[in-house]
């Protein structure tokens, strides 16, 4: 059973996350020739202050 774990910054809509799950699942199914029903996707959202880019938080640089 393929499992994809995706870390994203908070702020995406539920619709965007549903689209991400669907499209990642389809890509994995297609590329690995695995049944779509066997694919698992885990989305982990993190606060912008928990992610650093170039020594500053994503929040501090306006991401």
From Swiss-Prot:
Catalyzes the ketonization of 2-hydroxymuconate stereoselectively to yield 2-oxo-3-hexenedioate. One of its GO terms (biological process) is salicylic acid catabolic process. It catalyses: (2Z,4E)-2-hydroxyhexa-2,4-dienedioate = (3E)-2-oxohex-3-enedioate. Keywords: Aromatic hydrocarbons catabolism, Isomerase, Plasmid. It is an enzyme of class 5 (isomerase). This is 2-hydroxymuconate tautomerase. It holds the Pfam family Tautomerase. The gene is nahJ.
């Amino acid at each position: 059973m393929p499992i994809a774990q995706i870390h994203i910054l908070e702020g995406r809509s539920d619709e965007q996350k549903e689209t991400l799950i669907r499209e990642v699942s389809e890509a994995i199914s297609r590329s690995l020739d695995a049944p779509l029903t066997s694919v698992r996707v885990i989305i982990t959202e993190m606060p912008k202050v928990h992610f650093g880019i170039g020594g500053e938080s994503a929040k501090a640089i306006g991401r």
